[in-house]
Amino acid sequence: MIIVFLTLSTFYIALLLLQPALPQPFMALFKTLPIGLLIVMVLKARSQLQNRTFITLLLALSFSALGDVLLALDTGQLFIGGLAAFFVSHGFYIITMLPIKNWRLDVVLLYLFLAIIVFCLFYPNLNEMLIPVLFYMLVLTIMASFTWMTDKSNGFLVLGGAVFVISDSILGLNRFYLEIAHADIAIMGSYYLAQFCLVKGFLQATSKHK
């Protein structure tokens, strides 16, 4: 399953180098295939997952796939739809990590500090995107922080949260601050790694608690 995931992820990233050779709908399809495989991984692990974890993971990945499609088809107007889809996705990841019992103020402050720095760079160019981006950064910060504090916490979860922050920071900087060479490669490579680590982390945590 890991080999297939790596193959699908690498294939899409390679396709990015060919743009605009493929029409947007095809790019959107290939973009979502690695996330579709993660959904299959969760479905195969159904017997080892609690009902809430199973449902919230499926919803988190499904909204991620929707966000992928909207961003792949983005002509400007669909960006906020993609942002909203990922906002909901992070919300379901957060629910999956509840309850939080091991509060870590140092982790929260670190992620808040990083979010403030990045937001200050975005701010002059956000305009009507100010509120949506602010709320998205807040939920992303909470999700990444919770990977340290949930009783399901493990190396995969922590890495997944951190790499998701890196991926979205590159995306935001490229869109709202300055154009970054080969940003799409860096964004998608880190994004696929983050999603894989989050799913792997949740599945590993569930196995550990059985």
Give residue spans per PLM region.
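Polytopic alpha-helical membrane-helix bundles and their juxtamembrane interface segments
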Residues: 1-210
